[in-house]
Amino acid sequence: MATTLKDVARQAGVSHTTCSAALRGLPNVSPRTRKKVLAAAQALHYNTNLSARMLRSNHSGLISFVVPDLSPTYYSMLSVELAREATSAGMQLVVQQSQHSASEESSIIGSALSSLADGFFVAPVAHYTDEDLSMLIGDKPAVILGDFTQTTQYDRVESPNSEGVNSAIQHLRQQGCTSIGIVGGMTDDKEADIPEGSSILTLQGLRMHAAMDALADLYHENRESIVNERLIDVGWNSDEGIRAANLFMESGMPYDGLFCLDDEIALGMLHGLHEAGVRVPEQVKIIGFNGIRHSAISTPTLSTVEVDLPGMASAVVSLLRRRIEHPDVETLPQKVTVGTILRARESTAAGNV
């Protein structure tokens, strides 16, 4: 009798759900538990059964999610939503991290494990052309996150950066802010393969440019002036947010409103300002972007532009499933833009600034 996932879970002494999450590389499983599950799978030859399944049906039922890093809560939350959607569709999600390395990303996509996948969802570090991706994944379907590669033949899913940024800036203005700054740098992808002279941008770059354009229109200034006068240039994590808070205070707190390009930056800023005795929102109002779970429980709670991650996951799985199940049906590449919701909370509450 073939070994089942339930058998592996029983051997490892974990629940069916935990076993499935561990085998798929999801972030909510401890390293110790993951090691125990993998050992049980190996002992029971569970991978062999996967190979047999492929021989029978020519499909593994696996979707590979290639992501820069699971440390940002945004990607962790997205992976959970993707796993839920994949399971509902009778598929399994495998998550692999490139650690922001273009070379590692290419290696992962072309690896033996990835060769088992029926399709790919890639949050890219490198800036691929159609030919690049085709060489790595062959004729398998792929969905690209964002609009910053040179691909034209693959489906893509993206969040509306310009619309989300504009809603955040408009919210700060409605709450009484007269001088608004941007917090966050262009990119954390230190090894990103950006062609010389290219106008192609990473997710960070797209959001950054949208913010610069919004403030340039608001203050009738050019981008260079915005960068020089209204940008606190830091990385996209909470430690850098704390550093941004210090830079903001050292510069004399020139803004009464701050738009952080990412919630993790904003949460770091809230902590740094609180430690220094700066009152939010009384002295400065802060809004983030993404809608990660911690934004609702910080002190003060963080206003944010929440991305529809369940909708994104649903779109990704639907696009992949259609192409996996109907490989001979030629359809034009689809682009799905998911929605956002502005969550107004305590960090931008109206009052004196």
Could you say what each language-model-derived stretch is?
Residues 1-59, 352:
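N-terminal helix-turn-helix DNA-binding module of bacterial transcription factors
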Residues 3-4, 58-174, 254:
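Alpha-helical recognition/docking segments in bacterial nutrient-uptake
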Residues 43-49, 103, 124-126, 242, ...:
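Short gly/ser/thr-rich secondary-structure transition/capping motifs
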Residues 18-21, 56-70, 179-197:
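Short beta-strand segments enriched in small/hydrophobic residues
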Residues 43, 84-89, 137-144, 148-353:
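Bacterial carbohydrate/catabolite-sensing allosteric modules
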